[in-house]
Amino acid sequence: MSIVGRNAILNLRISLCPLFMGKRSFVSSPVSNSAKAVKFLKAQRRKQKNEAKQATLKASTDKVDPVLGRADTPFITRIMAELKEPLVLSKGYNIEEVDKFLAAIESAKRERAELSGLNTEVVGIEDIEKLEDRREAILRILSMRNSENKNAIKMAVELARKEFERFPGDTGSSEVQAACMTVRIQNMANHIKEHRKDFANTRNLRILVQQRQAILRYLKRDNPEKYYWTIQKLGLNDAAITDEFNMDRRYMQDYEFFGDKILIRDSKKVANQKRKEIRKQKRATF
């Protein structure tokens, strides 16, 4: 083969090489692109699932009622249970004082019987049953369960003060004031739930919640360790204290203040956002 023929064949091979290379890249590109697409879709699904889990976890841990706090808070439950005890008496009385009072009456009766010349043994047997009946009657009258709401709240505030006091007789520390306000807030909220048209007390409740926020914010600046201990014990979290909120119908509906009653209609934007959150939570369960 001549030199001219060899050069022609070499030039033909060089000219055909890009065509083969282009054809090879054209055939392999759909496979590589499909693999990338699958990886991208899997990554997106993992991301959506993680976001849904995070949203569900945040909603379950951080959603604390800024007015009433967490449900079944031990501090509140314990005080309310204390007020229902039959042996917890109103007006500051206790069982020992009632027994002393009845013993003094019995002693005075015996002295009068001796002075009048009556048989004290017969009188004593008759008075034992009467004395027990009187004791039960006095305990029923003084029982906090049968007392006025004003006396019950006074007793609850005193119990809260003793539990949060820094020293005996402490009434001015921030945690004591916040605890006493929390007891009043719980009582006022229960009253409003039973009397929905009591707008005056609804306004007073709003003011009381704002005052508690202000006191706890001051405590956070002054003593952060004591602040977090206090809000944990009161069933609150940091967002319930630091975040601004309006105790309006939106709050009452979101936190079911009046149960499942619908107080305000959601706009289309809000309704779509809620549906989107529900779908995310459902994806997280799968």
UniProtKB/Swiss-Prot annotation:
InterPro entries: Ribosomal_uS15, Ribosomal_uS15_bac-type, uS15_NS1_RNA-bd_sf. The keyword Transcription does not apply. GO terms for biological process: mitochondrial translation. Residues 1-33 form a transit peptide. One of its GO terms (cellular component) is mitochondrial small ribosomal subunit. Keywords: Mitochondrion, Ribonucleoprotein, Ribosomal protein, RNA-binding, rRNA-binding, Transit peptide. It is found in: Mitochondrion. GO terms for molecular function: rRNA binding; structural constituent of ribosome. The precursor is processed in two steps involving mitochondrial intermediate peptidase (MIP) and mitochondrial processing peptidase (MPP). Present with 6960 molecules/cell in log phase SD medium. Belongs to the universal ribosomal protein uS15 family. Component of the mitochondrial ribosome (mitoribosome), a dedicated translation machinery responsible for the synthesis of mitochondrial genome-encoded proteins, including at least some of the essential transmembrane subunits of the mitochondrial respiratory chain. The mitoribosomes are attached to the mitochondrial inner membrane and translation products are cotranslationally integrated into the membrane. Component of the mitochondrial small ribosomal subunit (mt-SSU). Mature yeast 74S mitochondrial ribosomes consist of a small (37S) and a large (54S) subunit. The 37S small subunit contains a 15S ribosomal RNA (15S mt-rRNA) and 34 different proteins. The 54S large subunit contains a 21S rRNA (21S mt-rRNA) and 46 different proteins. PANTHER family: RIBOSOMAL PROTEIN S15, BACTERIAL AND ORGANELLAR (PTHR23321), SMALL RIBOSOMAL SUBUNIT PROTEIN US15M (PTHR23321:SF26). This is Small ribosomal subunit protein uS15m.
